[in-house]
């Protein structure tokens, strides 16, 4: 049977054994890729600096997902949290990656077995001797089993009852660690940034799945509903499954891009909205003001700012700054961060403090403008010097650093002042090593950006797939061109293989 490439799945339409085989093989490919990719990432990952060179700066994609589920130790003798380790055992990065590869091999073997031994008695209707699947019953079984898994994850793994817990951190991504989480049963459980909601929602959704699964196992669908939704047609299963997948993909694209307790910034990097809203800048300013209120000097107050917090307040870590089609990790763009130079404070010749206007997310170039506390422009780097009124030279701008490597150092040379004013557009100023990786200086996105783009794109494609297959199964008789006035009863859909001569016909 010569089929075009876009119709090859016809061969498993009415062949339950081989339908199972191709799905097991798909699972083998997914698990094999996950395990292999994890081992590759472990081979290239440098765990030496979790503050300035975390996994998301290095372009790790699998490791953040493993870490958020409670894995933190490596057979290489390091821990993602920097704690000393003794014997990580199977519950480690390499152990879990290896388990996925072993599982992939077992799935490959079982897929091969089911492909060869496709004609099993279990797939035949004993009354007719023909292939038949009780799809509502199968739906009930799968719903029950997925409910058990969902409940078990929330009640045992996340809570630490039998498992490690999950990654939990503070709102500014400074104190993250693996810890058990108690379910949040109140209104706070609906806050996407409350980890307790992960436990409670998995428990609740799991119980709902178990109850719904038992319902579908014990209650048969009404005949009109069965026929109206084509519940006997395997393409109905395909359509509704695609719907579940695209819905989930849209949800996780949102929780990743906008941030949530499931996507901590220590593992996936900050969100673009944290730059847009000056989230870290406000927290840094709050801490500095608190230090000044304790009678600390400006230098001492800035020296207490964690380097990790300052690093988040840098536009190069904004996932929306990297183009979607610029391949590579963030480190391949602006380089590997080496150290925080400190916070620059600019002043004019009268001693008034000036603030560099920060670059908005969607600008590649932006005028360097310095404003006073009222927002009035006082200095800039002009495009045309002949017409300038506010140039650094004319206004007499100087810069002094507080905290960081240049703490207490000041500059009045206009060329140096302009250099740091340009860099202050991008947030806190860091020394970046572009030589080691031959970084090209062009910003890259973080795994947060890749994940969102991939899942939003495939969700859209799967949405159209759901519409396509749903329409095919609901309106199969119309699409097949069967005359509605036909007086011969055709049992259409019992055998759907192309050219099948055994479809029953019966004159009414």
Curated annotation (Swiss-Prot):
Q: What is its main location?
A: plastid
Judging by the UniProt lineage, the source's domain of life is: Eukaryota
Q: Name one GO cellular component term.
A: photosystem II
Pfam families listed in its UniProt record:
PSII
Keywords attached to this entry:
Chlorophyll, Chloroplast, Chromophore, Membrane, Photosynthesis, Photosystem II, Plastid, Thylakoid, Transmembrane, Transmembrane helix
TM region positions = 21-36, 101-115, 140-156, 203-218, 237-252, 457-472
Identification of the protein by name: Photosystem II CP47 reaction center protein
Give the organism, scientific name. Welwitschia mirabilis
The taxonomy runs: Eukaryota, Viridiplantae, Streptophyta, Embryophyta, Tracheophyta
